[in-house]
Regions:
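Divalent metal-coordination and catalytic microenvironments
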Residues: 44, 58, 68, 99, ...
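C-terminal regulatory/interaction regions
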Residues: 274-307
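Metallo-beta-lactamase
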Residues: 11, 15-17, 21-27, 34-35, 64, 71-73, 153-154, 160-162, ...
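Active-site HxH/HxHxD metal-binding segment of metal-dependent hydrolases
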Residues: 45, 73-76, 83-171, 278-281, ...
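Bacterial Sec-dependent signal peptides at the C-terminal "C-region" and cleavage site
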Residues: 2-14
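Short, flexible loop segments at the rims of nucleotide/cofactor-binding pockets, characterized by
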Residues: 24, 45-47, 70, 95-98, ...
């Protein structure tokens, strides 16, 4: 698989160093199924994932929503973390995913069996979740672990356990929970980011769970052979860069420097890693990848460079 450095040079954080339980238990780029403690991100938003892979719980009196599940094994950690916070997984009314790979949504059907909550995803994501197989236009197609699949009858009849985010029922649920989708294809064709407002008294913050935006692939894949996909990738980066972003969360905690920020203090502090820094770095990796693949293609398609 062609890969790029995950984070590059670290940006220094400032603030008082603290001993956060998650920092003590977990390392950067830790094992994807290693249990880590749940913690409150802000008001009604909680981190309930493993040490290596994120899962986010957003709570409300009317029910909760969960974004990502980790692997099938990781889903058991997620469920245990939800219970450890005092919440009942059966009160989860909506399931969302960041991108259609087994390390992030491989346990989503396991959690759905317990919660009976619908999964809201993109059109492409529905096909992957239902079949358990990545699509051929995924840059990592052929290298990904398969996931559990659903029999066709279970998602073509009502009530369907999987909804496309632009369906009326899905839009009703998203509006009810105050969460909005941001399509972000790039790392995978069906990648989705999610944003919501969370309030502590009169202070409301915008939280973004931004999909992975690394330009990685199988060895024989070239982004420069797929110019339309490159433009979609760049548009995804711009959507995240332009979005209000008080707190950044990512499917891989290390991608948003979560451990560094927690070690220094709070995820909503002024020194926290946010969407502008995140997308600037990911864009630089994409540019490097395109130049590595075909410098002449870059000159022809982006004569002024990629801003």
């Amino acid at each position: 698989m062609l890969a790029l450095p995950l984070l590059g040079a670290r940006e220094p954080t400032t603030g008082p160093l603290t001993t956060h339980p998650w920092v003590t238990a977990c390392k950067d780029r830790d094992d994807r199924d290693k249990p880590g403690p749940a913690f409150q991100v802000y008001r009604n938003t909680y981190y309930v994932g493993t040490c290596g892979v994120s899962a986010i719980l957003v709570t409300s009196p009317e029910g909760h929503l969960l974004i990502d599940s980790g692997t099938e094994a990781g889903a058991e950690v997620v469920l245990a973390n939800i219970r450890a916070l005092g919440f009942d997984p059966k009160d989860i009314k909506l399931l969302l995913g960041s991108h259609e790979h087994s390390d992030h949504i491989g346990g989503l059907l396991t959690i759905q069996e317990i919660t009976r909550a619908p999964i809201v995803t993109s059109f492409e994501g529905l096909n992957v979740i239902a079949s358990g197989q990545a699509t051929k236009d995924d840059p990592r197609y052929g290298t990904l672990e398969p996931m559990r699949s659903l029999p066709e009858s279970s998602y073509t009849i009502e009530p369907s356990p999987i909804l496309r985010y632009n369906e009326p029922k899905a839009q009703f649920l998203l509006d009810k929970f105050g969460v909005w989708p941001i399509p972000t294809p790039g790392y995978s064709p069906a990648a989705m980011s999610w944003t919501w407002r969370d309030c502590e008294g009169d202070e409301c913050l915008t939280i973004i769970y931004a999909a992975n935006l690394l330009p990685v692939s199988r060895d024989d894949y070239k982004f420069t052979d797929n110019p339309r996909y490159v433009h979609e990738f760049l548009a995804s980066l711009q959507r995240i860069a332009d979005a209000p972003c008080d707190i950044l969360l990512t499917p891989l905690p290390s991608a948003s420097k979560m451990r560094d920020t927690l070690r220094a203090g709070s995820l909503n502090a002024s020194y926290a890693y946010r969407c502008d820094s995140y997308t600037r770095f990911q864009r630089s990796l994409l540019i490097d990848r395109l130049l590595q693949e075909d410098p002449e293609w870059m000159k022809k398609n982006f004569p002024q460079g990629i801003k």
